[in-house]
């Protein structure tokens, strides 16, 4: 399957046959960083802080620790065979065509759902400046812009993600520095609250809402990490994957500590966790609370671009998944055709049309944070399925192809053990989703997707698999 589409370094091959390796190491590193700083951090951290208090810091650290090993497994598998275009390919190769089909389509749906959440978030951020702006205007404008830019070249996507990620990095580093200065100067807000690290343990301790509050923070916190595997969909368009992928994956722990742990510590030191409003972004509210509305507008711009960045990643990855699925014969053939600029234009257009579902969600659930929570729960469950498939593929790889593991230049540490630990953790998170009413509703809806996929496989997949065996 993986050799049906050749991947070339430049413009030598016909556009309709080949993806091009036009993403440089600079692009890959920033795509990896941008993928790790998702909308869930900016939009969802208000609710997670409200649910868990300071213990949310440990929630992010635990999830980040687990996902680092998932990414190490993905990295070793992708580098074991450079013909793999994405994790959908190695799933199909190692687990069977059904796995490639389920993984590819689920990952496509993951990013469509995530894109809907981003559309919802963008609407909320736009209303910070324009309270009377219609929901669909901001959403439609962003979707059209992303489609236009992605239709250009893959390098344009890389450049967009580079600058989107740079904006996020500068903003978070600035927030951390400003917050530390406020704490050092014992800054007092207009409400009389003095900035202090003591807020982390003085107001009920590290676990003010007990274990139930701690566990409740996992759902949106998991969603904050979706996109961390995005570098796995760029493998076919990366100039030097042997160097770029390990470097991007190895930097994950540092990114998590810097962007998640430090920023949350600063937020809860300047604004006591009990004062954080769950319906609003604490990144924006921090500056509003200390009387800096201009800075709040800047941060609002940053979180808006963050949501746009996440949607941009989704548009890119969904179109590449549709391209791969079409090449395998389990998606419409039209998605297998590339434009003159070597981008899957029809897949891009189709995915962007699907993103408009985010506007529909706002009408079904008028509460922005309510719509966001429902969408992100579905997304988190589906992403955990994809991450589990990556781990299962790794276990089969270790059993069936030990020689490839032995000569691998990028071995996963504690490989087999951590695969089982991570999968047990994902089961634990799914169980937690049954405890809250809003997440339980989404959990009950999610199986419908797998039922639909199963029916599709009965009619399409088996026929295609038989053809491949011939």
Q: Where do the protein language model's features map onto the residues?
A:
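Helix-loop-helix junctions that connect adjacent transmembrane segments
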Residues: 14-19, 56-57, 131-134, 166-301
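Membrane-interface "cap" regions at the ends of multi-pass membrane proteins
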Residues: 1-46, 50-55, 68-72, 83-84, ...
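TM-loop-TM module centered on a large, flexible mid-protein loop between adjacent transmembrane helices
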Residues: 89-92, 96, 128, 201, ...
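C-terminal membrane-solvent junction of multi-pass transporters and transport-like membrane proteins
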Residues: 163-164, 334-345, 384-438, 467-469
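Membrane-helix boundary/coupling elements in multi-pass transport proteins
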Residues: 83-84, 106-121, 225-238, 296-333, ...
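Extracellular loop-to-transmembrane helix junctions
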Residues: 19-20, 43-138, 148, 254-257, ...
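Helix-loop-helix connectors at the membrane interface of multi-pass transporters/channels
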Residues: 4-15, 89-92, 119-139, 171-174, ...
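Membrane-interface loop-to-helix entry segments
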Residues: 123, 136-195, 226, 249-253, ...
């Amino acid at each position: 399957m993986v050799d049906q589409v050749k991947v070339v370094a430049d413009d030598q091959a016909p556009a309709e046959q080949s993806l091009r390796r036009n993403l440089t190491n600079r692009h890959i590193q920033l795509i990896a960083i941008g993928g790790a700083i998702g909308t869930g951090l900016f939009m969802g951290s208000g609710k997670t802080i409200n649910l868990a208090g300071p213990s949310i810091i440990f929630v992010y650290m635990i999830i980040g620790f687990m996902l680092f090993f998932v990414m190490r497994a993905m990295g070793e598998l992708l580098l074991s065979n450079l013909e793999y275009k994405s994790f959908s390919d190695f799933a199909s190769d190692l687990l069977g065509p059904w796995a490639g089909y389920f993984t590819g389509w689920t990952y496509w749906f993951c990013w469509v759902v995530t894109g809907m959440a981003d559309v919802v978030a963008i609407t909320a951020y736009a209303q910070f400046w324009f309270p009377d702006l219609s929901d669909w205007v901001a959403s439609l404008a962003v979707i059209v812009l992303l489609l236009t830019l992605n239709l250009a070249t893959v390098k344009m996507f890389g450049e967009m993600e580079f600058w989107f990620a740079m904006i996020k990095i500068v903003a978070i580093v600035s927030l951390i520095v400003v917050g530390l200065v406020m704490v050092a100067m014992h800054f007092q807000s207009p409400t009389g609250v003095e900035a202090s690290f003591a807020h982390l343990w003085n107001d009920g301790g590290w676990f003010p809402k007990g274990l139930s509050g701690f566990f409740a923070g996992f759902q949106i916190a998991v969603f904050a990490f979706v996109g961390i595997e995005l570098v796995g969909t760029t493998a076919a368009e990366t100039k030097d994957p042997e160097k770029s992928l390990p470097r991007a994956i190895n930097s994950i722990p540092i990114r998590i500590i810097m962007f998640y742990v430090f920023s949350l510590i600063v937020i809860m030191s300047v604004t006591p966790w009990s004062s954080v409003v769950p319906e609003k972004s604490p990144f924006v509210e921090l500056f509003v609370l200390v009387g800096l509305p201009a800075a709040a507008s800047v941060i609002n711009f940053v979180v808006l671009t963050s949501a746009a960045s996440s949607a941009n990643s989704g548009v890119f990855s969904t179109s590449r998944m549709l391209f791969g699925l079409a090449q395998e014969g389990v998606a419409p053939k039209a998605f297998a055709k590339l434009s003159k600029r070597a981008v899957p234009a029809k897949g891009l257009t189709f995915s962007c049309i699907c993103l408009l579902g985010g506007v529909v969600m706002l009408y079904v659930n008028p509460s922005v944070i309510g719509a966001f929570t429902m969408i992100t729960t579905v997304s988190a469950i589906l992403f955990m399925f994809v991450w589990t498939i990556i781990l299962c593929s790794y276990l089969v790889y270790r059993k069936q192809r030990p020689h490839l593991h032995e000569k691998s230049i990028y071995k996963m540490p504690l490989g087999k053990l951590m695969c089982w630990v991570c999968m047990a953790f994902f089961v634990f998170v799914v169980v937690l989703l049954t405890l809250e009413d809003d997440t339980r509703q989404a959990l009950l809806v999610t199986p419908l997707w797998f039922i639909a996929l199963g029916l599709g496989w009965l009619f399409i997949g088996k026929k295609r698999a038989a053809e491949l065996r011939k």
